[in-house]
């Protein structure tokens, strides 16, 4: 068999762990049969997510006659995210050639982004009027995957555990994400030193989100 791309690696893991067999010896064969007899199989899926979105801002501000406040931010974003999944399938049919399968798939995503923010507050006696604009957030993201699989089978009277761990990190072409801009307006009334009343309205059209296809692949 020839192994290319993400899809081919899935076939490689399945074949080397005896979960699947090709229907012929043709090296270009793409049809397989399963060596697992499905009945009342029990499935477990453990998922662990962790990561962060860090934003570093460079701030500029100004004040005009203690009436008009202006602010401007330049933001640099950093994203690191790990999705770690462990899938287990057990309690196969007694006639199954393969049983107790464990598949680990780790997705690592990281990248950097950029955005701008502008805001102003107008002070009129006890009234405060605010307006802010958040530019779109542009990101370039990289994805990597690491996979391994294990299974059990019998060879005569002997139980054999197959551990297939290529120790390969699959890397994919970067892709771009754009999170749409947001506009906010606010009103506040200050009751001297006794309190205040405020209201804020924000608008963001998420249908303008963008995901490029530069990194499109079978995964």
Task: Identify the role of each PLM range.
Residues 1-219:
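Outer-membrane beta-barrel porins/channels
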């Amino acid at each position: 068999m020839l192994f290319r791309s993400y899809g081919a690696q899935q076939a490689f893991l399945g074949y080397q762990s005896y979960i699947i067999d090709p229907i012929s010896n043709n090296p270009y064969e793409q049809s397989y049969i399963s060596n697992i007899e499905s009945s009342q199989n029990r499935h477990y899926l453990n998922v662990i997510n962790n990561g962060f979105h860090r934003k570093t801002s460079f701030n500029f501000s100004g004040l005009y006659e203690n009436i008009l406040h202006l602010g401007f931010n330049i933001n640099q974003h950093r994203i690191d995210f790990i999705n770690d999944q462990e899938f287990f399938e057990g309690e196969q049919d007694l006639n199954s050639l393969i049983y107790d399968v464990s598949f680990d798939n780790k997705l690592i995503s990281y990248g950097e982004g950029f955005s701008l923010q502008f805001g102003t507050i107008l002070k009129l006696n006890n009234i405060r009027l605010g307006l802010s604009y958040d530019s779109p957030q542009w990101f370039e993201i990289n994805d990597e995957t690491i996979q391994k699989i294990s299974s059990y089978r019998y060879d005569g009277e002997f139980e054999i555990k197959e551990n297939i761990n290529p120790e390969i990190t699959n890397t994919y072409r970067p892709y771009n994400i754009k999170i749409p801009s947001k506009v906010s307006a606010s009103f506040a009334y200050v009751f001297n030193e006794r309190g205040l009343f405020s209201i804020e309205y924000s608008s963001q059209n998420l249908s303008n989100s963008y995901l490029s296809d530069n990194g499109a692949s079978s995964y």
